[in-house]
Amino acid sequence: YQKQQFFDDPILSSELLEEDPIGRYPQITFSAMPQLFSPAPVYFSLDSQYANFMRDEGTEGSRVDINPLLNWPMKLSHHFIFETQAGLRETAYLDTHNKEEGEDFDDNRILPTFRASLSTKFIKIFPSKSNSQRRYRHTIEPEVSYFYLSHEDQDDLPDYDGTDRIEQQNRFTIGLTNRLMTKLFLPDGSSSEREMFFVRAGQFYDANTSSQPFSNSFLELRSRPTDYLYLKSDLEYDAYDSEIEVFNGLINIFDRRGDYLNFEYRYAGASDDEANSKFPDITSNGFADTFFEEDP
């Protein structure tokens, strides 16, 4: 729940590009999926990025951002999963040059993080009434979590993008996930799976804020009711002002041959609405890769 924007390619406004045009040449990203780290169920993962920033005015230079994480999940009384995660995010700024002041410098930032969550899962598996070779699995997954990110003075660091200004976080989150999966057993013994419906809702409480500590309520929805239709949207609702602050909608339509059509709509508060249609490559959207194993 730390990331509330669910679209991979945010649209940059022309005003932003005109105010602070900046290039990244090159930008290299490396991520390591969670790997078992010890005999105990401790997993190691890594997100890292190198980028070299160039622009006509202001500060330019290179940045290395490394975020290693240790994750320790454990079962409690066969019904609950308690998970802890610790990280030490380090960001190094190299060969930094301020064109306005004519200064060269290097700097770095270290941000310890900690996360703990408690969750459970209610599961029901049932057959299809119209097809004996198909199974459905419905899960309801409530979760409460706590996330802490330490404070660090970042005023003297370069400001290239959102990575350079990360606010202190001390948050309690409550969320609920509702998921419907389907699995079809094929005559050759293989099977195919599809996530038909996914909806997640939640809200967090910021312990560092005395006024209006509750965040926007956020809702994420995605659905693939057929093999040729995919729907996705996310929404943020401001309970203090009683208004929708952010809404994004996406519709993908495609056929057996690989032709596809993409419709998008984006709304962000007082900014202008945006609607567009395009024909991008449609890639996997991270459907769940674990499922039940009953034979038909």
Which sequence ranges carry the predicted segments?
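Outer-membrane beta-barrel proteins and related beta-barrel translocases across Gram-negative bacteria
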Residues: 1-296
